[in-house]
Structure formats: structure tokens, C-alpha cells
Regions:
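Catalytic, metal-anchored helix/loop core of enzyme active sites in primary metabolism
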Residues: 1-142
């Protein structure tokens, strides 16, 4: 609810490392772009004294329909996360360009995942091909 935890990783020993920051996606995006290096980012810093506590809730799978699909893609593994990501990227772009409605985003992702036959251990060439095929399939239908 405070929107300050941008990512967490749990290790096999049970330890968890989290990236925290102000409710602003610039920091996690910058981290992803420049990893393993760190760059200066101006702006507000997270103030733990003002924050006082961090609370957690179960995710609302009915409101955030993309979350169970992302979890399904992760469990399926192989090339399925590529399909999820490609379908999500293109569907969101189509929504932002007013080519589809908001709820169509979820239909596009679900249908893209349903039709995909998972490649268990894809190499880079296969991942790029799956991404391209997913884009082409969506473009031909929406």
C-alpha cells in the first residue's frame, strides 16, 4: 500500500533482498537500465522516519488480472514469459494509442498465452522469434 518496495528476491536460504524507494518508477527503471552500475538520480529520497511502517496485503487477483497471468507465465517457464511480456507490451501500446479498450489488454495476453506451445529452454534466437511471432499474431487480429 505504501508503494515503496519496487522489487524483492527470495533466496534459497530464505533470505530476502528488496529494493525500496519513493513511489516513483524512475529508480527501478534506471537500475534495470544501468545494472550493475549505479548512477545519480536527483529527487526525493525515501524517509524511513516519515514512512514509519510498511504494510502488506494479499494481491487482488480479480482487480489486477495481469498478475495471475504473469504468475502462470512464470510457472510455465521456458518461452512463456516472453509471450506474456510481448503481448503485454503490444496490448498496452495499442491501448495508449486508443486502438483497443483497457480490458482488451487482458484478452490479448490470455489468447497469446493460450495459443503458444512452450519451448522449454529457449536460446536467444528462439526468444526473439517467439517475441516476433507474438507481435505478428496480435497485429493480425487487433
Amino acid at each position: 500500500p505504501q508503494s515503496v518496495i519496487h522489487s524483492m528476491v527470495e533466496f534459497k536460504d530464505g533470505g530476502i533482498i528488496a529494493q525500496l524507494g519513493t513511489p516513483d518508477m524512475r529508480l527501478p527503471i534506471q537500475y534495470a537500465l544501468y545494472y550493475p552500475h549505479r548512477r545519480y538520480l536527483g529527487g526525493e529520497r525515501l524517509d524511513f522516519a516519515a514512512l514509519r511502517q510498511i504494510t502488506f496485503e494479499e494481491p487482488d487477483m480479480e482487480t489486477f488480472l495481469g498478475l495471475p497471468m504473469a504468475m502462470q507465465a512464470s510457472r510455465a517457464g521456458g518461452s512463456m514469459p516472453t509471450v506474456f511480456n510481448a503481448a503485454n507490451e503490444l496490448a498496452v501500446s495499442k491501448f495508449l494509442h486508443q486502438e483497443i479498450g483497457f480490458l482488451d489488454i487482458y484478452d490479448i495476453i490470455a489468447q497469446s498465452m493460450e495459443r503458444h506451445k512452450v519451448i522449454e529452454n529457449p536460446n536467444l534466437e528462439e526468444i526473439l522469434a517467439v517475441e516476433s511471432e507474438t507481435y505478428q499474431w496480435i497485429e493480425s487480429r487487433w
